[in-house]
Amino acid sequence: MRNLFKAFIFRLRKDLTFRITLIVGGALAVGLALILFFIDLGLKNVDFDMKLCTGQTLFVSSLSPAQNFGLAVPINLITFTVLEFTQGTIRNKIITGNSKTKIYFSLILSGIVFTLLLMFAYVGLCVGLGSIFGGFDPHGMVMGLVNGTVSPEFLWKIGVLALLAYIFIAVMTIFFASLIRNVGPCIPIVIILIMIFYFGGTIASVMSALGEILGDGMKNFLLAIKYIDPLYSLAAFSSEVDPNTGASYLAISNADFWTEVINNLIYIAAFTLGGWLLFRKRDVK
């Protein structure tokens, strides 16, 4: 398996798709930071004190699996993985004596590395540019779809959940890419699932805030979504109000955090095991 992973790293260094994705991610990060920076410059003229282009704002916003680069990563991973089958790379690995178990788990490991390398580069550049233009304050304000101050606890919690979420997305992507082995149908399936998980959590969170207006059946349904959606807390972290100051702040409760950690680990294990079992039974042409 070590040799298979080394072969993946060697191919990745020469892969045009990976390089193009890195360039696109860099361009998107620079473009986003510049847009927010110039908006901040314009808002200075109307006495708007809050900054949009800050390290903490870009950190939180860049983690979303539903934003432009978050969706580009699984699309490119699908292409990369399907080519392993269509170009005969997987078949050659079997011919040279590698077991299907080693091959599939090397695909999983390679997919995770592929995904995390791209996301670390993108998020790191976003945070770096935001920090240069507007500073980074671990207790500062985040401006976006949800506004509020952050804390070091919130930042590390959402960072851990994002890490697990992208590992889950990578494993799910490898599952469908190795099962379908065709880019055409695989891309919409994966993207639709990501959007359902992400926006399903957002909608469920908004509806849950209605409280007593909802009936018991709807409350139970929304609670079930919370426990089965692997992207729930990443999409639906709450904006709380400090009763003493009236200021809003972003928070992920310990219960929600550990629910999502366990949830993601279960999904990762299920897709890995299911994909491995299916891969062992299918012929590779």
Predicted regions mapped to residue ranges:
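Alpha-helical transmembrane segments of multi-pass membrane transporters/translocases
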Residues: 2-3, 19-21, 25, 237-285
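Transmembrane helix boundary and interhelical loop/hinge segments in multi-pass membrane proteins
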Residues: 77-101
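Short, membrane-interfacial amphipathic segments enriched in basic
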Residues: 1-6, 163, 167
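Membrane-interface helix starts
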Residues: 10-26, 184
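Secretory targeting signals
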Residues: 28-80, 105-181, 209, 213-261
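Membrane-interacting alpha-helical segments
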Residues: 2-9, 13, 153, 222-225
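Aromatic-anchored segments of alpha-helical transmembrane domains
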Residues: 28-34, 192-202
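Membrane-helix interface segments
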Residues: 17-18, 99-105, 182-186
